[in-house]
């Protein structure tokens, strides 16, 4: 059995921006401290929610270094270093390891339309090049590429391939992965509305967008499940559904950055080509935040 990088709720943290569009490292530091104070179990930096596609190489590596330094060993730091260019992913992954990241989050190659054999070769090459755990990231709605259970079972034989973040939204697919891989691969939910279903299939937690605005709550969904308080965990999961729906009423991370700004954080805007949500989406999110209790 592979020891999980974390158990519980990891925040897929936003990258706050200044008004001139540069990364607001001071605010990132404040958010990191607040997340840890509210029981976040790990921090994922430079993921989808962190706007990794529009960060420069310098910003990407600096965000990882800054987060490692700020977290200071209090929680694991997982660096998003995936790419559709294997050579580049290896470079970025080795840099993140050298800068102190505890693990890597590696999205499947996108746009290239590689085969399952290509995925095996891609991930094996990255895992061979580093000495820290690799969490694979399956999100076919964004990448057009789906990691099959058979491919994951083969990849799980590699000692550095520790887990998969499963964001297909297909709970049957998750069940097939769990059956195919057993204890050789940890599974994390990549969907906030499917935390409890995935835990019921043996999952170890969630890499969460919701946790940006409700870190303690998201942690508690997992903690209560692992403590045997499954009815309470389920109740909390269901209560959060309207808020989760609102957080994904537009392309992530547009709504969650709006919500963070609304809560008083200096999250800033998303970088182009992402633009602000419509007034209707903002109103939906405002209502959901009020009903959930985030706003008075």
Question: Predicted segments — roles?
Answer:
Residues 138, 160-161, 271-272:
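Glycine-rich phosphate-binding "P-loop"
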Residues 69-75, 99-100, 130-132, 157-160, ...:
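Short helix-capping segments at alpha-helix termini
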Residues 28, 60, 64, 89, ...:
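A general structural signal for well-ordered alpha-helical segments in protein cores
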Residues 128-129, 142-248:
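Catalytic alpha/beta core domains of metabolic enzymes, predominantly
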Residues 5-16, 38-40, 200-203, 207-296:
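C-terminal alpha-helical cap/extension of soluble enzyme domains
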Residues 25-32, 149, 282-289:
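Short, amphipathic alpha-helical "lid/cap" segments that border enzyme active or binding sites
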Residues 2-11, 15-144:
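Active-site beta->alpha loop and helix N-cap motifs at the rims of alpha/beta catalytic domains
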């Amino acid at each position: 059995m592979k020891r999980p990088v974390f158990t519980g709720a990891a925040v897929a943290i936003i990258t706050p921006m200044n008004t001139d569009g540069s990364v607001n490292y001071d605010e990132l530091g404040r958010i990191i401290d607040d997340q840890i104070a509210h029981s976040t179990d790990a921090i994922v930096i430079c993921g989808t929610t962190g706007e990794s596609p529009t960060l420069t190489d310098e910003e990407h590596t600096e965000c990882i270094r800054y987060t490692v330094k700020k977290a200071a060993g209090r929680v694991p730091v997982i660096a998003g270093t995936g790419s559709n260019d294997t050579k580049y992913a290896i470079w970025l992954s080795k840099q993140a390891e050298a800068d102190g990241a505890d693990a890597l989050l590696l999205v499947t190659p996108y746009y290239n339309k590689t085969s399952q054999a290509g995925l095996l070769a891609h991930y094996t090459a990255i895992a061979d090049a580093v000495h820290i755990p690799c969490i694979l990231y399956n999100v076919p709605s964004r990448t057009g590429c789906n990691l099959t259970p058979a491919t994951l079972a083969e990849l799980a034989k590699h000692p550095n391939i520790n887990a998969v973040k499963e964001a297909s939204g297909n709970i049957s697919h998750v069940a097939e992965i769990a059956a195919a891989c057993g204890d050789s691969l940890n599974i994390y939910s990549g969907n906030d509305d499917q935390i409890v279903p995935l835990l019921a299939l043996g999952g170890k937690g969630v890499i969460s967008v919701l946790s940006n605005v409700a870190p303690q709550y998201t942690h508690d969904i997992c903690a209560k499940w692992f403590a045997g308080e499954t009815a309470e965990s389920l109740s909390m999961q269901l209560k959060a559904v309207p808020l989760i729906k609102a957080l994904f009423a537009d392309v992530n991370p547009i709504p969650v950055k709006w919500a963070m700004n609304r809560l008083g954080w200096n999250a800033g805007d998303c970088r182009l080509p992402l633009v602000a949500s419509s007034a209707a989406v903002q109103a939906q999110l405002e209502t959901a935040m009020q009903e959930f209790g985030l706003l008075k």
